Amino acid sequence: MDDHQEEGPEKVKLFGMWASPYVLKVRWALSIKGVEYEYVEEDLRNKSSDLLEHNPVHKKVPVLLYRGRPVAESDVIVEFVDEAWSHRGGRILPDDPYQRAMARFWLSPPIWKWFTAAPGEGQEAALGAAVEQLQVLEDLLAVGGKEFFAGESVGLVDLSLGAMAYVVPMYEEIIGVRLVTEERFPSLSAWMGRFLDSPPVKDHPPPVERLKPRYRAMREAFLNMG
């Protein structure tokens, strides 16, 4: 349990699990805002009574406890954090309503099917679809030569796509197929490096080496299901 919590009426607690990219996304958002909090690591095979009490519908992490009141689901939590601490740190969501809507569009990017596809025509089709989707992201970054999708600092789209920066290289290693290269996606490739070097991610870096065996097992499970 990490002792990163706010004193007094704004005491904040986060229930999470080390391997979850959704939990990492919330931790990065809290870091952007400079929010101190208590972190509670959950065993998802033996969920605590506190987690079940605070998220009785989905019974999963992350759950943020703020002034004794729970907020569940990572996307909801990130927006809550941005609004609850609007006076601190950088803005996560754009102020402009249209830009805010466009940022929300990328909350769940559909690029992961290629990891679950078996070698052969199915994998080739999934890779082709992933390349098309990544090209859209490449073009978004290339316009104006932006450092991040939000501009000069990490924002909602960067947090939503952040798992790509460390999961895609792991997928490539496991499958043996290169997807994001400097030649094919120069802006996106550079963004992945910048994102991993950004302050919120360096505060809570993804545990890549610990994750690799987990993703290899997931890949095998997907293939065996086919």
Whereabouts are the PLM-identified features?
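Short amphipathic alpha-helical segments embedded in low-complexity Lys/Glu-rich regions
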Residues: K47-S48, T116, R178, V208-P213
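GST superfamily/GST-like fold recognition
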Residues: G151-I175, E183-S189
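A contiguous, mid-protein "functional segment" used to position or interact
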Residues: E183-E209
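C-terminal helix/juxtamembrane-tail motif
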Residues: E209-G226
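GST-like domain detector, emphasizing the conserved glutathione-binding G-site
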Residues: M1-F149, S153, E220-L223
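Membrane interface segments of multi-pass transport proteins and intramembrane proteases
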Residues: L93, R178-E182
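Alpha-helical scaffold segments in carbohydrate-active enzymes
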Residues: F105, Q133-V136, S160-V167, S187-D197
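Surface-exposed helix-capping loop/turn segments at secondary-structure junctions
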Residues: D139-G151, E173-I175, P199-P205
